Amino acid sequence: KLFVLMAAAVVANPTLAAGDAEAGEAKAAPCAACHGPGGAKPIAGNYPKLAGQGEAYLVKQLQDYKSGKRENAIMAGQVANLSEQDMADLGAYYASQEPSIGQADPDWVEQGAKLYRGGDMANGLPACSGCHGPAGQGVEGTKYPLLAGQNAQYVEEQLKAFRAAGRNDLGDNVVKRTNDTDGDAPGMMQTVAAKMSDSQIKAV
């Protein structure tokens, strides 16, 4: 598998506070319980790695958890008392850490690589690399996140949540995730993931 999580659309945001990585390290102590020391080794596959992730992307996710735009009961509690400066410091700290290497499933690598680099033009699925870079390194200035090395289970769950939002799936156990919209149009990741099959999501 290529451990790829496709990201949010580019949206203008208020100017972020300048982050202090040293201050962020002290503030990150509670985060380590789930995401591991330095954010490199989460306790479970459905928790994301944070080490080396783009600073602006991390801050944006914390802001979205706090506002309720991105829903997660655990994270909502964790960010409830964070200030903008706290979030900036945490973003700076985790962005300064060395990302860890993920494990690849050889049965899915070839298909995942083709989809990531070339998409599925017959079905209108764009290449992930167009936004996330040829090696999944992300594009910090646009808040497209680092994808290389991310936990496969987390990637798969997030893509399915984007897909559920894009297709407006119904059901008591359906988990949806949305990202920023362009006017009245659905957000980029909902639109992209809605075109993906289960096998394509697993491969990517």
Give the predicted meaning of each segment.
Residues A23-A32, E55, R117-S129, Y144, ...:
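Sequence context surrounding c-type heme c attachment/ligation sites in exported
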Residues K1-L16:
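Gram-negative bacterial Sec-dependent N-terminal signal peptides
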Residues P42-K49, D64-D107, E140-L146, R163-A203:
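Axial heme c-ligation environment in periplasmic c-type cytochrome domains
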Residues N13-A28, G38-N46, A95-A122:
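Electrostatic cytochrome c docking/interface patches
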